[in-house]
């Protein structure tokens, strides 16, 4: 196969918070590179996942959910999502099968009105609705925007995902691969480790605590015996949040550490010594300097 025949391109996955964008990307790749939880706004950064097929490389971009931003952190997240619409080859607009089009979807469709790339509607969570309801949802969205294709899927079960990849493949232009064919993401290991720790905090804590946390890997060392030693700081905004993350007699921090360490060991394929500590960084989500320091820039 000649280089001209090879196809490669970038595919942006956008939608409001908590519609399953990260779950879909993990399902497409057949591996977990993006953290997930049942809470909205789990994804904060642009995440690139690389899916290789014979003669084709698709770089899928997972983005934060598009919402009305309040804090500087939220504004950063929305800016990341909106910037991903530009200079991509395909846009996947992900919605839920069990929810009617609402104001947030309307706002996103307005943003897509001038998109240069073809926009495909992906209706997720089809396992939650009957066929009649799904057909109604397809008709409702088709009346709102001239989507090039409409593909129903269940990111959780994988139903329809293979067909989605086939449909996307048809829109990928000719070009050489952007990345080697043996990597799933261009993200550094430190970033993925920090995200795995943050995922456990999202899953184990509640209310405002998950949204007030930033994790920074401060030390990442491979020892002579093959064990990897990692030290990470969990930044919160208030003393009360610090107490919640640590928990009674340190039990919550132990749970976070144990669950994160197991996943990190699977990622790195080696034993890991994980040290976590919690510090108060007051109002970091509104502080430009700290946002950059914590990787939100």
Curated annotation (Swiss-Prot):
Binding-site list for GTP: 15-22, 62-66, 124-127
Region (G2): 41-45
GO molecular function: GTP binding; GTPase activity; ribosomal small subunit binding; small ribosomal subunit rRNA binding
PROSITE patterns named in the record: G_ERA, KH_TYPE_2
Keyword rRNA-binding (UniProt): yes
Span of domain Era-type G: 7-174
Stretches the record annotates as G3: 62-65
Compartment(s) of residence: Cytoplasm; Cell inner membrane
Record Gene3D superfamilies: 3.30.300.20, P-loop containing nucleotide triphosphate hydrolases (3.40.50.300)
GO cellular component, one term: plasma membrane
Annotated region (G1), positions in chain: 15-22
Single biological process term from Gene Ontology: ribosomal small subunit assembly
Main location: cytoplasm
InterPro entries, per database record: G_ERA_dom, GTP-bd, GTPase_Era-like, KH_dom-like_a/b, KH_dom_type_2, KH_sf_prok-type, P-loop_NTPase, Small_GTP-bd
KH type-2 domain residues: 205-282
Membrane-related topology note: Peripheral membrane protein
Region (G4): 124-127
Residue ranges of the region described as G5: 153-155
Pfam families: KH_2 (PF07650), MMR_HSR1 (PF01926)
UniProt-listed PANTHER family: GTPASE ERA, GTPASE ERA, MITOCHONDRIAL
Role summary: An essential GTPase that binds both GDP and GTP, with rapid nucleotide exchange. Plays a role in 16S rRNA processing and 30S ribosomal subunit biogenesis and possibly also in cell cycle regulation and energy metabolism.
Subunit architecture: Monomer.
Family label: Belongs to the TRAFAC class TrmE-Era-EngA-EngB-Septin-like GTPase superfamily. Era GTPase family.
Name of the molecule in the record: GTPase Era
Gene: era
């Amino acid at each position: 196969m000649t280089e001209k025949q090879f196809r490669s391109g970038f595919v942006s996955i956008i939608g409001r918070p908590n519609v399953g964008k990260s779950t879909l990307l993990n399902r497409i790749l057949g591996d977990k590179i993006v953290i997930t939880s049942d809470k909205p706004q789990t994804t904060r950064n642009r995440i690139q996942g690389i899916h290789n097929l014979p003669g084709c490389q698709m770089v899928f971009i997972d983005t934060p959910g598009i919402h009305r931003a309040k804090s500087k952190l939220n504004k950063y997240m929305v800016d990341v999502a909106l910037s991903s619409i530009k200079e991509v080859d395909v846009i996947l607009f992900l919605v839920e099968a069990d929810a009617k089009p609402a104001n947030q979807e309307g706002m996103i469709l307005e943003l897509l009105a001038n998109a240069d790339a073809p926009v495909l509607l992906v209706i997720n969570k089809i396992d939650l609705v009957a066929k009649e309801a799904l057909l109604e949802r397809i008709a409702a969205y088709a009346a709102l925007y001239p989507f090039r294709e409409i593909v129903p899927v269940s990111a959780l079960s994988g139903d329809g995902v293979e067909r989605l990849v086939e449909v996307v493949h048809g829109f990928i232009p000719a070009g050489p691969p952007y990345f080697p064919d043996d990597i799933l993401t261009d993200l550094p290991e430190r970033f993925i480790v920090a995200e795995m720790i943050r995922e456990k905090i999202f899953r184990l804590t509640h209310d405002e605590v998950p949204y007030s946390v930033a994790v920074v890997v401060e030390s990442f060392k491979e020892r002579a015996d093959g064990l990897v030693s990692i030290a990470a700081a969990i930044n919160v905004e208030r003393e009360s949040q610090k107490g919640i993350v640590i928990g009674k007699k340190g039990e919550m921090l132990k749970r976070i550490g144990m669950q994160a360490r197991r996943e990190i060991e699977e990622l790195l394929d080696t034993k890991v010594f994980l040290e976590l500590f919690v510090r108060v960084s007051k109002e970091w989500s509104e502080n430009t300097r700290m946002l950059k320091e914590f990787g939100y820039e």
